[in-house]
From Swiss-Prot:
GO terms for molecular function: proton-transporting ATP synthase activity, rotational mechanism. It comes from the Eukaryota. One of its GO terms (cellular component) is chloroplast thylakoid membrane. InterPro entries: ATP_synth_b/b'su_bac/chlpt. It is found in: Plastid, Chloroplast thylakoid membrane. This is ATP synthase subunit b, chloroplastic. PANTHER family: ATP SYNTHASE SUBUNIT B, CHLOROPLASTIC. Its main location: plastid.
Length: 179
C-alpha cells in the first residue's frame, strides 16, 4: 500500500511540474476520429476472428466430448462383453473341473477294479501254476518211487528168478491179455 501511495504522489508531482493536466476535446487535433475508427475496426475484425476462433474451439471441444462419450460407450460395451465372457469362462472352468473330477473318479475306480481283477487273475494263475508244479512233482516222485521199487524188485528177483519162473510169469500175462 505504501508503494501505491508513493507512486501516486510521484505522478501527481510530475503533472504539477508540467503545468496542467486536462483532456484535449478537439477531436481533429487529438485524432479521436481515427482512434474511434481504428478501435471499431479492430473490434469488428477482432470480434469476428474471436467469434470464429471461439466457434472453432467450441466445435473441437464438442467433438472431443462426443468422441469421449463414444469411447466411453464402446468401453462400457466392451466391459459388458468382457464380463459376459468372464462369466462364461468361469462356467466352462467349473464344468471342466466337475468333468475332470468325475473322470478322475472313474479312472480311479477303473484302475482299482482293473487292479483287483489283475490281482485275482495273477492269484488264479499262480494257483494254477502251483497245482501244475505239484502234479509234475508228484508224477516225478511217483516215477522215482516206481523206478526205485523196480530197481529193488529187479535186484531181489535177479537172485530168485530163474528161467522157468520167468516163463510162467510171461505165460500168465499173455493169457490175461488174450482173455
Amino acid at each position: 500500500m505504501h508503494l501505491y501511495t508513493q507512486t501516486l504522489n510521484t505522478v501527481t508531482g510530475l503533472l504539477a511540474n508540467e503545468g496542467s493536466f486536462g483532456l484535449n476535446l478537439d477531436i481533429f487535433e487529438a485524432n479521436l476520429i481515427n482512434i474511434v475508427i481504428l478501435g471499431g475496426g479492430i473490434f469488428k475484425l477482432g470480434s469476428t476472428a474471436l467469434s470464429e476462433s471461439l466457434a472453432e474451439r467450441q466445435q473441437k471441444i464438442v467433438g472431443a466430448i462426443q468422441e469421449s462419450e463414444e469411447r466411453l460407450e464402446q468401453a462400457v460395451t466392451k466391459l459388458t462383453e468382457s464380463e459376459k465372457q468372464l462369466a462364461q469362462a468361469q462356467l466352462v472352468i467349473t464344468s471342466l473341473k466337475e468333468e475332470a473330477e468325475a473322470t478322475a473318479k472313474q479312472v480311479k475306480s477303473g484302475i482299482l477294479t482293473d487292479g483287483k481283477a489283475e490281482i485275482e487273475r495273477l492269484t488264479a494263475s499262480a494257483k494254477g501254476q502251483i497245482g501244475t508244479i505239484e502234479k509234475k512233482i508228484r508224477k516225478e516222485i511217483s516215477e522215482y518211487v516206481v523206478t526205485l521199487a523196480l530197481q529193488r524188485v529187479t535186484l531181489q528177483l535177479e537172485g530168485k528168478l530163474d528161467v522157468n519162473l520167468q516163463q510162467q510169469i510171461i505165460d500168465k500175462n499173455i493169457s490175461k491179455l488174450e482173455g
